[in-house]
Amino acid sequence: FEIKINWIMHIAIAGNIGAGKTTLTKSLGKHYKYEVEFEDVVDNPYLDDFYNQMERWSFNLQIYFLNSRFRQLRDIISNGRNVIQDRTIYEDANIFAPNLHAMGLMTNRDYKNYRSLFDLMEETVKSPDLLIYLRSSIPNLVSQIHKRGREYENSISIEYLSRLNERYEAWIHSYEKGELLVIDIDDIDFVESKGDLQKIIDLIDEKVK
């Protein structure tokens, strides 16, 4: 008899606001013919309110993202198809929520509640086979944020982006949940240059072959 092993490839793309995660997700999905899972920013009912009044809406927003990404991971497992995911469940818990808490924009009880819920969910999900981290300088992030022109992002401060960048670097430095590929996007333009995109594809192929 024949034993069939269904091996699903799950690639996730991580990075700060404006790093180019969504663009790269689309490009890689097209190249590999994988399904794509995007971060829910279009239908998110809390984003506008959060950027206008962070302290009031931080917990609501983080719970919404946690719920959304947990559902994505559940769907990835149940669908049984190769997928590229725009941002991971780990970024909320290791970067965004603790940053809001440290800045005094999320209360102790809300943060403990959030963290408890994440820890419970984390026990039931599988980490990505490959995590791609898009590393970027603050000036580059600011340039990209202004270029794409999302109105709710106009109020994002340099300090906020810098704090997130510091937490991203600390998280990536200790990441051991699977294969990791770090791409410095200050030195590469995968949007305008097909050659640069191919360089990324070659690096991915080397990691997952």
Regions found by a protein language model. Give the residues of each.
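P-loop (Walker A) phosphate-binding loop of NTP-binding proteins
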Residues: 16
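Glycine-rich phosphate-binding loop used to anchor ATP phosphates in small-molecule kinases
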Residues: 57, 61-126
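Conserved lysine of the Walker
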Residues: 21
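Conserved substrate/cofactor phosphate-moiety recognition/catalytic segment
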Residues: 30-68
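Hydrophobic anchor at the beta1->P-loop junction of P-loop NTPases
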Residues: 13
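NTP-dependent small-molecule kinase module
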Residues: 142-209
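A glycine- and Lys/Arg-enriched "phosphate-lid" helix/loop adjacent to the NTP-binding pocket
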Residues: 95-167
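Post-Walker A alpha-helix
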Residues: 24-25
